[in-house]
Swiss-Prot record:
It comes from Laribacter hongkongensis (strain HLHK9). InterPro entries: Ribosomal_bL20, RIBOSOMAL_L20_CS, Ribosomal_protein_bL20_C. This is Large ribosomal subunit protein bL20. GO terms for biological process: ribosomal large subunit assembly; translation. The gene is rplT. One of its GO terms (molecular function) is rRNA binding.
Length: 119
């Protein structure tokens, strides 16, 4: 059997990793051994943070809804409970948008929530 030389495949693999490490600082951008570790770690961070992004946006929406609801004299939990009792099914993303950009509409929702809590 002929001898297999791996120069071409090794070069391609090194180029691929170094291309992924483009823009990194120091030896991480041009030393294969260091760049490989940096790219692996970047991938781990990306995987983790794609999941965290969903949690962080939900937290942001809840904070915005809470602030707007408190301006209208109702806490977040009571507001959400009131909406549920009034059978108004609007998700937190839309509620947060209304709280920021459509304050009058949000105030109407708060009034409906208050009415359903009182009933």
């Amino acid at each position: 059997m002929p001898r297999v030389k791996r120069g071409v495949t090794a070069r391609a693999r090194h180029k691929k990793v170094l291309a992924l490490a483009k823009g990194y600082r120091g030896r991480r951008k041009n030393v294969y051994r260091v760049a490989k570790q940096a790219v692996m770690k970047a991938g781990q961070y990306a995987y983790r943070d794609r999941r965290q992004r969903k949690r962080q946006f939900r937290q942001l929406w809840i904070a915005r809804i809470n602030a707007a609801a408190r301006e209208c004299g109702l806490s977040y939990s009571k507001f959400m409970n009131g909406l549920k009792k009034a059978s108004i099914e609007i998700d937190r993303k839309v509620l947060a948008d209304l709280a920021v950009f459509e304050k009058a509409v949000f105030a109407q929702l708060v009034e409906k929530a208050k009415a359903s809590l009182a009933a």
